[in-house]
Amino acid sequence: MVLGCLVATAAVLWGCRRVLTRIDVAATAEGPATLETIRATALRDLDAAADACRRGEPDRAVCRDISMALRRFAALACDSDLDYEGLDELSRHAEEDPRLDPVVAVVGRCYAVEFDPKGHGVDTDELLADAVRTVRSWT
């Protein structure tokens, strides 16, 4: 069980590195990072997760991609390290910044799939739609 959690954590951190690289490249190409450039990058990452879902990738992998994209977006939008924090820490931040409530809701649903060996019946299309709605409505 502990080994499984460590492997899952390593996979999440590895994925965050990939997302960071994409955002750095996007920021370099598009100029200074603004909410709109951060939003555009997050939406591209969520589109990539949707493509993975359509290709038949496992729900666990799709949920990991959704979670990483959404946490990275929130981290950049809040100028913090939320993408490196777990769900509990993210929830504590949401108590101070209510904009994070929808992020916590989506990431919580993703974590249920990512970290439960049995997985859960999840509607990845609905989860993706909620993540996209969260990114688009961020102010």
What does each of the following model-derived ranges do?
Residues 48-51, 57-139:
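Membrane-proximal, non-transmembrane interaction modules
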Residues 1-53, 137-139:
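Hydrophobic, helix-length membrane anchors
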